[in-house]
């Protein structure tokens, strides 16, 4: 539209309001091209409401990003929606005075959006369930790779996690919080996923802490053993106060039957049954604690922040919406798993 057409449309909307009609406008003036973020509202709304005697009803549309009506994948309409039917939440706020500014109305709409986000909780999966679902959908796509040359597809990663879970049951028996001291790597990712699918709370210990600081973390979480790697054990020569077990020894030489059993469960076992089997009948809920992230201990003993599955997965969803990742994108993660962003983004 040119300037003349725009003025005509504003006048027509104003005339409709005076005639007692309901006028619905998209105050941003354009479709968001940045992950569905709410853009600045335009002043045209104030021109429409000038000399009117009608309330303003703020309305928020949540979860539209990814539908055919969004600019997801850099195009509108001509794309396949992420799911069918596509869930959208429409929220209505309290009526606002006629003379409300466009910034005040935007503030109310954003507040509605924050409330609407909480409604997504019923549609969000735990970390383990989301990983299994992704592995089943993207079987041959690369899941993990590291600088040692290791590279795993999603289904091979899921099968490896299943084998690892069987091997770790004895070492982690009777523990809810389990300690891991492994740098960002394929092995570290698999160990974390094994703990999460078992329903454990994984505690990635900060290997830059002093021995005293690591012992404090171990004692606070009542950790009975720490899963690490041979290189880390040799290099750091730490004594955390509990046995340190090398992942290489735990995971080495899986038998033919172990591989076949893991492949069967990974490929054919129904997801719900698989999740119950891996967690011994007690799969975690969204509100269960997925990980504990400790501070650096610069102001005393390290302090642990407990993050639930909902904390982690909702942040992952927000990152995905803001950055609009594609199927062929690759994420280079350098932050360690004992860092909150490292656990969320790197893992």
Q: Residue ranges of each PLM-predicted region?
A:
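Conserved AMP-binding/adenylate-forming
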Residues: 166-209, 334-336
């Amino acid at each position: 539209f040119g300037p003349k057409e725009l003025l005509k449309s504003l006048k027509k909307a104003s005339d409709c309001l005076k005639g007692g009609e309901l006028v619905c406008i998209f105050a941003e003036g354009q479709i968001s091209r940045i992950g569905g973020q709410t853009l600045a509202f335009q002043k045209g709304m104030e021109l429409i409401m000038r000399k009117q005697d009608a309330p303003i009803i703020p309305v928020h549309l949540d979860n539209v990003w990814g539908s055919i009506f969004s600019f997801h994948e850099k195009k509108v309409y001509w794309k396949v929606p992420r799911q069918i039917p596509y869930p959208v939440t429409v929220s209505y706020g309290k009526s606002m005075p006629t003379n409300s500014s466009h910034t005040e109305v935007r503030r109310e709409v954003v507040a509605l959006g924050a409330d609407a986000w909480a409604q997504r909780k019923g549609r969000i999966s735990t970390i383990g369930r989301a990983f299994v679902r992704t592995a089943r959908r993207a079987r041959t796509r690369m899941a993990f790779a590291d600088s040692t040359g290791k590279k795993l597809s999603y289904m091979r990663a899921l099968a490896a996690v299943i084998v690892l879970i069987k091997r770790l049951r004895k070492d982690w028996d009777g523990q809810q919080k389990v300690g891991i001291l492994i740098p960002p790597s394929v092995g570290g990712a698999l160990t974390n996923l094994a703990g999460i699918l078992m329903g454990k709370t994984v505690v990635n210990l900060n290997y830059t802490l002093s021995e005293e600081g690591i012992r404090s973390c171990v004692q606070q979480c009542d950790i009975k053993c720490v899963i690490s790697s041979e290189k880390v054990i040799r290099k750091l020569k730490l004594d955390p106060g509990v046995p340190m077990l090398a992942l290489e020894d735990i995971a080495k030489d899986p038998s033919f039957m172990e591989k076949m059993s893991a492949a069967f469960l990974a490929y054919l076992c129904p997801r719900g049954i698989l999740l119950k089997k891996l967690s011994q009948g007690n799969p975690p809920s969204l509100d269960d604690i997925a990980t504990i992230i400790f501070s650096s201990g610069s102001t005393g003993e390290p302090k642990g922040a407990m993050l639930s599955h909902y904390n982690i997965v909702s942040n992952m969803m927000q990152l995905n919406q803001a950055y609009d990742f594609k199927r062929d994108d690759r994420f280079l993660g350098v932050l360690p798993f004992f860092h909150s962003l490292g656990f969320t983004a790197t893992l």
